[in-house]
Every structure is written in C-alpha cells, then in structure tokens.
Amino acid sequence: MRNRGFGRRELLVAMAMLVSVTGCARHASGARPASTTLPAGADLADRFAELERRYDARLGVYVPATGTTAAIEYRADERFAFCSTFKAPLVAAVLHQNPLTHLDKLITYTSDDIRSISPVAQQHVQTGMTIGQLCDAAIRYSDGTAANLLLADLGGPGGGTAAFTGYLRSLGDTVSRLDAEEPELNRDPPGDERDTTTPHAIALVLQQLVLGNALPPDKRALLTDWMARNTTGAKRIRAGFPADWKVIDKTGTGDYGRANDIAVVWSPTGVPYVVAVMSDRAGGGYDAEPREALLAEAATCVAGVLA
C-alpha cells in the first residue's frame, strides 16, 4: 500500500461501484412481482436448527423485510459478539464525522501499537498510514491496529468506543455496544453483554449505511467499494450465494468459536437484501474453532428463499 493522498480516482472508482450495484436495483425495484413472498418461517427455522446441531453451535440470522418479502429471523434478537463486524459501521462513523479531505490525514504509530491480526498496519510502522488507508485496511483485511487507530481518531469525551456506540444510537440502534478495542473485544465470555450486537440490530444499521441515507452518496460509495473488495469473506455469505449475485460484506471472528458475517446482496435483477449471520460455539470453550462452513450453509438457505 503506497502512502499517497486519497485522490479523485479512488472516489470515482467507488462511485462507479455504487452505481453498478445499486443502479439496477432502483430500476428493478418497481418491477418485482407482488407475489414474491417468503415461505412459512417454520421450515427455515428447522433447517437452521439442524445446522446448529450439526455444527454444535448457536446461530443467529436476520434479513430485514422488503416491500414484498417478510423478514427472515432466527435468534435475531439474541446477543452475539460483534467481533470485527463493527469495523464497517466504525468506518461509516469516521466518514460521517469528517469531510472527505480527512481521509488524507496521516496517522503515525509505533510498534507498541500493533495488535494481533494487523497484516497491513504492521508493514507501515515507519511511514504511518492515512485515514483512508486505515479504513481500507480495517474493512478489507480486518486489520485490528487500523481499527484501533480509527477509534482513536473518532475520539470524543468517552473515547472512541463511546463515540462509536453513540453513532449507532444516532442510527436508532439501542441494542449494540462497544466497550473495548482490538483484540480484547473478541474475548468477552459467553453471556457478557459487552461488545455485542444482535443480528437484527446490525442488519438494520447496515441497511441504513449501504441502502439508506445515513451517509451521503460519495461516502456511501466508498464504504460500499471497500466492502465489495473485502478479502476475508470468501467462505462465508459469499460462498452461500450463487455466482451471479453481487455480495459486499464484513466478517468477524473471535474466541468461543465466534464467526460472523454481515452483507448486502443483490440478486441478478438488482434487488438488494441485507443479510446478517452470526454464530458461536461456546460449548466448545475458549478455544472452540469457528465454523465458516456454518455461515455458508446458512447463507445458502437464505439464498434459496430469496431466489
């Protein structure tokens, strides 16, 4: 990653991405048949329960209702650890709080600031990184140090975590909360409400950020582009949808077998849906292995309904 300013080219590319994934959705939204409805929830719930048994896991799923489809819900209002899914609304909070020129601000840091899973930040200790580069690293590579530096930049009287939670409250999310930075936020024991959200809450936040007006078009385009080029989600929601669906996402992984993914997906005709899939395997203890295949199979169930 070169240390250079956030230029017009990057913004134009991001705007092009936003048009490509949403333009056909606007065109198609009025053409969807009124008969497009979801099947009875019991059948899907049984399939999700079977996945829980097979993977020895707890699964949470939420797909918000659209004008012609009912919501898909399974443990949608149970709390799950954020893990790195918080980085998508974190970047949105930074974009919301500042003008686009803020993306060129250089942030310097030392080796003492490097945290686990920081593949990008650890390469730039000598040069520092711009806010724009930190946003890119936090979303596309789930870089923990980048996220902590963005939290510090977000600032506020109670610190970055309080400012982040406050941003969620401004979007109407009264459930989610962030209490710690990376990597501690991934380590809270089962049943602890710190650093948690629900599939329902995070899905509605993502809906506002990508499909709503929580961000102006230019900033929304940047967030959409970074999520579209995410490098960590190939085996999760993306794996569960057919190749002709467009998917943008942000993953999260943590202790106690936690594996999450939040996404916006577009059908081949351009119809958008928000999909949140969260999981943990607390019964396996602190070192339980996250199961990406569980998320992929849950996404396949969702895709089968939406298709």
Swiss-Prot record:
Post-translational note: Exported by the Tat system. The position of the signal peptide cleavage has not been experimentally proven.
Q: When the coding gene is removed by deletion, what phenotypic consequences does the entry describe?
A: Cells lacking this gene become significantly more susceptible (16- to 32-fold) to penicillins as well as third-generation cephalosporins and carbapenems. They have no detectable beta-lactamase activity.
Q: Which domain of life is it from?
A: Bacteria
- Explain how it is applied in biotechnology: Can be used as a biomarker, which together with BlaC-specific fluorogenic substrates, allows a rapid and accurate detection of very low numbers of M.tuberculosis for the clinical diagnosis of tuberculosis in sputum and other specimens.
**Enzyme Commission no:** 3.5.2.6
Predominant subcellular localization, coarse grouping? membrane
Which Gene3D superfamilies does the protein's record reference? DD-peptidase/beta-lactamase superfamily
Result after altering T253A: Significant reduction of catalytic activity for both nitrocefin and ampicillin. Only minor impairment of the inactivation by clavulanate. Larger increase in resistance to carbapenems
Induction info reads: Constitutively expressed.
Query: What effect on the protein does mutating E182A have, as reported in its record?
Result: Loss of catalytic activity with cefamandole as substrate
What positions constitute the catalytic site?
S84 (acyl-ester intermediate), E182 (proton acceptor)
- What is the annotated signal peptide range for this record? 1-34
Q: Where in the cell is it found?
A: Cell inner membrane; Periplasm; Secreted
What Gene Ontology terms for biological process does this UniProt record contain?
beta-lactam antibiotic catabolic process; response to antibiotic
Instruction: Enumerate the residues marked as the site Increases nucleophilicity of active site Ser.
Output: K87
Q: Answer whether the UniProt record assigns the keyword Ligase to this protein.
A: no
Keywords, in A-Z order: Antibiotic resistance, Cell inner membrane, Cell membrane, Hydrolase, Membrane, Periplasm, Secreted, Signal
Similarity comment: Belongs to the class-A beta-lactamase family.
Assembly and oligomerization? Monomer.
- Protein name listed in UniProt: Beta-lactamase
Origin organism lineage? Bacteria, Bacillati, Actinomycetota, Actinomycetes, Mycobacteriales
Question: In the UniProt record, what gene is named as encoding this protein?
Answer: blaC
